[in-house]
Amino acid sequence: MAAEASAVQQLAGLLDQVDAPLKKTFELNQHEYGSKDKFTVVKVDGLADSLQNVTLFFDLSHTFGIPGNVHQGYPTETLLRFLKAREWHVNKAHRMLEDSLNWRMQNEIDSILEKPIIPVDLYRSIRDTQLIGLSGYSKEGIPVFAVGVGLSTYDKASVNYYVQSHIQINEYRDRFILPTVTKKYGRPITTCIKVLDMTGLKLSALHQMKIVTAISTVDDLNYPEKTETYYIVNAPYIFSACWKVVKPLLQERTRKKVHVLRGCGRDELLQIMDYSSLPHFCRQEGSGSSKHSSGDADNCFSLDHPFHQELYSFIQEQALNQELIKQGSLHVKIPEQDPEDAKIVEVIEAEFHKLGVQNGSANGIDQA
C-alpha cells in the first residue's frame, strides 16, 4: 500500500498549489458551516496506517472549519476516488480533479441546490420521465438508489433540465444524505448502491443515447467512484446482448462492480438490505418500474415519495434566501467525454443497430 499512499500524498501536494477559487470549491465554506473540526483520515483498503503522515493538504481544516463542498470532511477518500478513476496515475488524477473543480466553479455547482426547477408541474414531468430515487439503505447504511433505465424517456423537458435535476440529486446525496449516515453509523460512508431496472428496455432507447451519455459523462468526470455496486435487474435480451460486447471494454475495477441478477433480484438484494429498502420493482417478479410515477408514495421515482418531497422542498427553501426565483433551466456545460467512454457508446449504438436489423426493424429502433 506504500505506492498508493505515496500517490495520495503527491496528489495532495499538487492540489495544494491550485488557485484559491478552486481550492475553496474543493474544501469548505466556513461562514456557512461553522468552525474548526478536524478531518478524519479514512481507512480505505488498508491505507490508513500509510496515510498518517499525509498532512500538508489536510491541515487546512484548521483554517476552513467543518465539511462543506466536494470532500465533505474526507479529503483522503476524495483523492483516492480520483486516483482510482485514473488507475493511480497521479498527473492524470490531478488533471481530472482540477478540470472537475473548474467545471464546478464555471457552472456554479456549489449553489445548484438553490435553483429549483419550476413550476412544480414541470418538475413532476421530469420525475415521471427521469426515473431515479432513493429507495432506502443497505444493512451497512449505504444509500440505495433505484434507477428505471428501461422506462426513462427524457421527453418532457429540455436536456438542460434533466442534467440540472440529476446534478441536484448528486449534490444532495453528497452534501446531506452521505454525511447524515456517516454520523449515524460513526464511520465514513461516501458511496452508494444503484439498482438499475431494465424493464421496458427497447431498441428505441437509442433515441435517448445523447442525454444518457451527457449525464453519465458528468458523473464519470466529476463524481467518480461514487457508486460501490451496480445491480442489474429485470434484464431483457437486448441488455444481455449489449452487455456481452461492452463488458470486455470496461476496466476490471468497473466490471467487478456490476452484478446482473436473476429476474427482479429480490432474494439476492435481501441479503444486503431489508425489505423496506427494496426498490418497488424488486419486491415481486414482474413488478418492474412504473412508467408514470405520479401519485404513488411507495414508488421512489415519484415526486410524492418522501425523498423527492424532501429534496424539492429543501431546494425551494434555499432559493427563498437568494434573489427572486427565476424560471428556466440552468445551463450546465457537459464536459468532453473520455475517449474510452466514447468508444463504449459507439459499440452500444452499433449493437443496437445490429439487433434492429436482426429483428427486421427498418430503422433498427422499434423492437423490444
Residue ranges and their predicted role:
Residues 1-368:
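Basic, amphipathic alpha-helical/coil surface patches used to engage anionic, phosphate-bearing ligands
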